[in-house]
Regions:
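RNA-contacting regions in translation and RNA-metabolism proteins
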Residues: 1-140
Length: 140
């Protein structure tokens, strides 16, 4: 079960008001605000020519990441990486922990990690919240 704080709820309300997209989850860090939107609402969240995202970035004065939701863990992981081609996803279960090893090409590794590691850190936290699984990046 995902617990949302008052700040999370304020951010979700502002995002939904501006974009019209339905937000399933929100994660706020000092550098980034990340939203998970309902499957099929990603285009609405971004807006024509990125207009909604631009307004939201200005409102929060930090980087904004938007991901599409999925009930399938593998598809959710692919959604976390967006336009970055994921070559392979292997999920290993040991005892009570799950770890997803995500393979990307060496050329895409920097984009997958993100500036200051923000994309991979957010991805790990969101995957842990949604599926109780850790995320490891592997490059080939």
């Amino acid at each position: 079960m995902i617990e949302l704080t008052k700040d999370d709820m304020k951010c979700i309300t502002a995002f939904e008001t501006i974009s019209g997209a339905v937000v399933k989850d929100c994660l706020i860090t000092p550098a980034v605000v990340a939203f998970i939107v309902k499957a099929g609402d990603l285009g609405r969240a971004i807006g024509k020519k990125g207009a909604n995202i631009t307004r939201i970035r200005q409102l929060f004065a930090r980087q904004v990441l938007v991901f599409e939701d999925s009930e399938d863990m593998e598809q959710f992981i692919r959604n976390l990486f967006g336009a970055i081609p994921v070559q392979n996803i292997n999920v290993h279960e040991k005892m009570d922990s799950k770890i997803a090893f995500v393979s990307v090409s060496e050329n895409d590794r920097g984009n997958a990690i993100g500036r200051n590691g923000d994309r991979i850190k957010i991805g790990r936290q969101l995957l842990q919240r949604r599926f109780g699984c850790d995320l490891r990046l592997v490059s080939k």
